[in-house]
């Protein structure tokens, strides 16, 4: 007769232990050792001692939280944001920018088994040109919450300021809160997005019930008084333009239009430097044929087309392909072809795969580009630039190129999101002759 037992949950004792942190992981957590086990401790820096309690105990590692810090690292800084430690947006405001960059670079070097050649960075504060703020009506107080999610929770931190937002957006926060908090539809608001484009500021309001004419008038007056382009979104697919023209931003000498819901890099400064460095690494020549995979609306594709003989961009989202084609026309680029294809399927039968290319750039999502690596190898490009938002899948995909005879010529850490645990990077692979 079979017997069934419920699995025993590993319990943690609330015993206080003293640890010394000797390293940081890529997420900015302090790393310590206790009784032969690795401990990950948010909020601690290298060279700091602290009393901690274990919150999660696994076979190979444990997580802990600080009870009392006993010493401070010389690289500890006072967080600029009053919400730091509660808001889930930032994890590393307590660390110097230099330490953040060094620890992320070290984590990247360990994963890639290669020295980081450079850090591509820009201003560490006031860099974020897009924000999505959750909205929640509190019946007891009849107040509207507006802010970001708490770390590890769906609760909202009511933010009054956010120093990583570009100054124009941070200055808008109290005004947007006051406007939305005066609407009759307070109970039926989902979130509000703020975007700073070169053309001006956008506000996209998601509402879950129809707005009254009084609310619409109030929002329209607010948009005019603050010089905003206003968009209303009754669901996740539709939005209505209330005021404003098609938004656009400057990028590497080009003017790129975009829809309010289109993905654009939130850090304009690092994006400009990243694109410029990618073109430099590829050493684009007037006779080159260049392939850009996971191209989006042409963040790399269009700048590449200003230097190459021809460029092909491949993207899985049809709206972004359409926007890329439109921006090519607007910028007078006639040597660009965009394809709408799913790069997670069999790419060998896709029309772009029949062409020859001298150089390749790819910028996949977090899942990486496992499905296209063999096709890239078949193309035998001289140089490949891989832009990554996930170092684990980058390391995995790199193995295929290294086995095929490519070498890592350059490796850069992209400081796209200072004060957070996000690690982005860019690699140049060269074919061994």
From Swiss-Prot:
Its EC number is 2.1.1.190. It catalyses: uridine(1939) in 23S rRNA + S-adenosyl-L-methionine = 5-methyluridine(1939) in 23S rRNA + S-adenosyl-L-homocysteine + H(+). PROSITE patterns: SAM_MT_RNA_M5U, TRAM, TRMA_1, TRMA_2. The active site is at residue 389. Residues 10-68 form the TRAM domain. Disulfide bonds: none annotated. [4Fe-4S] cluster binds at residues 81, 87, 90, 162. Keywords: 4Fe-4S, Iron, Iron-sulfur, Metal-binding, Methyltransferase, rRNA processing, S-adenosyl-L-methionine, Transferase. InterPro entries: 23S_rRNA_MeTrfase_RlmD, MeTrfase_TrmA_AS, MeTrfase_TrmA_CS, NA-bd_OB-fold, SAM-dependent_MTases_sf, TRAM_dom, U5_MeTrfase_fam. One of its GO terms (molecular function) is RNA binding. The keyword Disulfide bond does not apply. S-adenosyl-L-methionine binds at residues 265, 294, 299, 315, 342, 363. GO terms for biological process: rRNA base methylation. It is an enzyme of class 2 (transferase). Catalyzes the formation of 5-methyl-uridine at position 1939 (m5U1939) in 23S rRNA. NCBIfam families: PRK13168.1 (NF009639), rumA (TIGR00479). Belongs to the class I-like SAM-binding methyltransferase superfamily. RNA M5U methyltransferase family. RlmD subfamily. PANTHER family: 23S RRNA (URACIL(1939)-C(5))-METHYLTRANSFERASE RLMD (PTHR11061:SF49), RNA M5U METHYLTRANSFERASE (PTHR11061). This is 23S rRNA (uracil(1939)-C(5))-methyltransferase RlmD. It comes from Shigella dysenteriae serotype 1 (strain Sd197). The gene is rlmD.
């Amino acid at each position: 007769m079979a017997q069934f037992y419920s699995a025993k949950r590993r319990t943690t004792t609330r015993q206080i232990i003293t640890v010394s942190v000797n390293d940081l992981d890529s997420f900015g957590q302090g790393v310590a050792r206790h009784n032969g086990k690795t401990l990950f401790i948010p909020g601690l820096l290298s060279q700091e001692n602290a009393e901690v309690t274990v919150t999660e105990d696994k076979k190979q590692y444990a997580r802990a939280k600080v009870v009392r810090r006993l010493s401070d690292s010389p690289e500890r800084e006072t967080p600029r944001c009053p919400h730091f430690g509660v808001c889930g947006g930032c994890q590393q405001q307590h660390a110097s920018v230099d330490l953040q960059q060094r620890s992320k670079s070290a984590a990247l070097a360990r994963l890639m088994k290669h020295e980081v050649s450079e850090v591509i960075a820009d201003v560490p504060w006031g860099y974020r040109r897009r924000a999505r703020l959750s909205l929640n009506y509190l019946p007891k107080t009849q107040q509207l919450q507006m802010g970001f999610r708490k770390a590890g929770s769906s609760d909202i931190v009511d933010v009054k300021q956010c120093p990583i937002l570009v100054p124009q957006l941070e200055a808008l926060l109290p005004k947007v809160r006051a406007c939305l908090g005066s609407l009759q539809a307070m109970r039926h608001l989902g979130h509000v997005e703020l975007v700073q484009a070169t053309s001006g500021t956008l506000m996209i309001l998601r509402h879950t019930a129809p707005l009254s004419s009084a609310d619409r008038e109030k929002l329209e007056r607010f948009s005019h008084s603050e010089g905003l382009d206003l968009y209303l979104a009754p669901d996740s697919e539709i939005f209505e333009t209330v005021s404003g023209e098609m938004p656009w931003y400057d990028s590497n000498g080009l003017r790129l239009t975009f829809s309010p819901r289109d993905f654009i890099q939130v850090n304009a400064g690092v994006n400009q430097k990243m694109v410029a460095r990618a073109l430099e690494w590829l050493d684009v020549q007037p006779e080159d044929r260049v392939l850009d995979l996971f191209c989006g609306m042409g963040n790399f594709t269009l700048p590449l087309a200003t230097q190459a003989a021809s460029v092909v961009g491949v993207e899985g989202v049809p709206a972004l392909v359409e926007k890329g084609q439109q921006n090519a026309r607007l910028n007078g680029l006639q040597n660009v072809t965009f394809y709408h294809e799913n790069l997670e399927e069999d790419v060998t039968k896709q029309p772009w795969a029949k062409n020859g290319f001298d150089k390749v750039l790819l910028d996949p999502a977090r899942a990486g580009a496992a499905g296209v690596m063999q096709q890239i190898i078949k193309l035998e490009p001289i140089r490949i630039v891989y832009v990554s938002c996930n170092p684990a899948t980058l390391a995995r995909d790199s193995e295929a190129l290294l086995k095929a005879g490519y070498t890592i010529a350059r490796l850069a850490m992209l400081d796209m999101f200072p004060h957070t645990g996000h690690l982005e990077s860019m690699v140049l692979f060269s074919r061994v002759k």
